[in-house]
Amino acid sequence: MESPIRTARRTLPLLIGATCLVLALTGCAGEDGPAQARPTPSASTSPKQAPALSAAQARDVITRYSKINNEANADLDRRQLDTVEDGPLYAMSVSDYTETEGLPAKDREPYKRWSYDLASAKLYIPRLAAGQERWFAAALSSEKGKAPSRLAVFAELPRHKRWEMVSVVDLDSQKLPDVALDREGYATAVPANDNKHLAADANLLRTAVLDNFATGGTNTGTKVFAPTKASKRQIKVHSDAATRFGDKGTSVFDGADNRFTDAYALKTADGGALILFSHTHTQTDAVAHSGLQINPGKDDRAWLHDVPRTSITYTFICNDAATVPAKSQPSRLIGYTCARTNASGPPLPSWTARA
């Protein structure tokens, strides 16, 4: 569910702030080609491969997405949403629906329609080999006249041959990556994994992001990434969690099984790559000793049903974007967007006995 309101909410809640730890007795470009980035002659391919689609077709895909996404969001219609979203983005959007359904009607925000501004959209359409799954990336804005600050990936799903958005990342800057374009304005797709021409691949980037959350970047995070706003924010989430409950509880991050291993990479003008990937992590809040409880917040109601817990494990699915150099230098995490997709934990024993 890719409304700007919901995406803005997703960007920040990696450290859940809605729970309350308390004592048990208290309450709590043109149509013929994209040509929106600086052309780079070195990005040309030989022999020339066909682009994934034309710029006009890509704009039609974006327009269709906005239209159907609005219709689905208004009715919390998962089936309709499934016709324009897939992969990690669909899982994140469905969790938004679930959260909304857990709220009383009076607490639900009225839905506001939106659309992407095609006039400011910057298309990164790669040339692809015959038989290669088709995809493209786009820098988008949901406000007319405002520079794009969101990177989206659209892929043609083989099972039904339609284009769907699979990933979206809110960037920390409106300065977009310098994607290399050939003379006709098309990008060059490069392998996102096992690419010996890059300083890091998607698997290593994912490991580094998880380390930022889990250890504050001690093991791999600060070695792989330069200190950008995005990586600093992840490290701050970790450090804030360490002192969040004082001596009354703990908050710990860890990696989790990741169903979404697809990654997408485009060559950049400096010979490196823009890599778009996803990861999954957990945050487990727990009381330090008996006599304490965690009271779920209203946004957790769909999963936790207002039942006090001794611990809660939240699951987050996130989309990430990084620029990677061709030589052995740190990569730059330029944005990430997350959504809580599950929450669970053992109820307070006294509550279980009453039930």
Curated annotation (Swiss-Prot):
UniProtKB keywords: Cell membrane, Lipoprotein, Membrane, Palmitate, Signal
Chain segments carrying region Disordered: 33-53
Signal peptide: 1-27
Subcellular location: Cell membrane
Polar residues: compositionally biased ranges: 39-48
GO cellular component terms listed in the entry, alphabetical order: plasma membrane
Ranges annotated as spanning the membrane: none
Residue numbers with lipid attached (S-diacylglycerol cysteine): C28
Membrane topology: Lipid-anchor
Lipidation (N-palmitoyl cysteine): C28
Principal cellular location given in the protein's record: membrane
Name of the featured protein: Uncharacterized lipoprotein SCO6871
